[in-house]
Amino acid sequence: MLNNLEKQTREIVIDVVERSAIQPGNLFVLGLSSSEILGSRIGKQSSLEVGQIVVEVVLDELNKRGVHLAVQGCEHVNRALVVERHVAESKQLEIVNVVPNLHAGGSAQMAAFQLMSDPVEVEEVIAHAGLDIGDTAIGMHIKRVQIPLIPCQRELGGAHVTALASRPKLIGGARADYNMDIIRKS
């Protein structure tokens, strides 16, 4: 199963990033349950190896596009997120003090701490899009109005995969004109 994990993750990330219309400089949230990928219940079989594979692929694809990654932790760290320090500072995000482990923060946050150059935890973000691998509930960190994206693959290992993009609110009613919806073109 781990043999295909990198390839499948890359296909999903490319699909979601391209269809979300996310722009350079925007934030992208990753929620990940390595336990769910391995076929267990969320939080019951955390795997640093799985976290490293997924986060490395996501970071690689986002870095190519100039998009910033925010890795969501579990409820034991109040769903805080790991970002690069320069991102936290430039976006004026509230830095909090916690170092993730397998059972508080999770494998993806541990991997982000290893793979990012100057990682910090922040309390919350308002991201433009995100990927949820294993039903980790990333919606609280995606700006309104959220648009569900059905990824090209709905499962990664044993984990259910969903994604969210966002668009500006439509205001003004029947008399108003709107820009084209670039996420849902058809």
UniProtKB/Swiss-Prot annotation:
Family: Belongs to the UPF0340 family.
InterPro entries per UniProt: Antibiotic_NAT-like (IPR028345), DUF436 (IPR006340)
Source species: Streptococcus pyogenes serotype M5 (strain Manfredo)
Descriptive protein name: UPF0340 protein SpyM50240
Listed SUPFAM superfamilies: TTHA0583/YokD-like
UniProt superkingdom: Bacteria
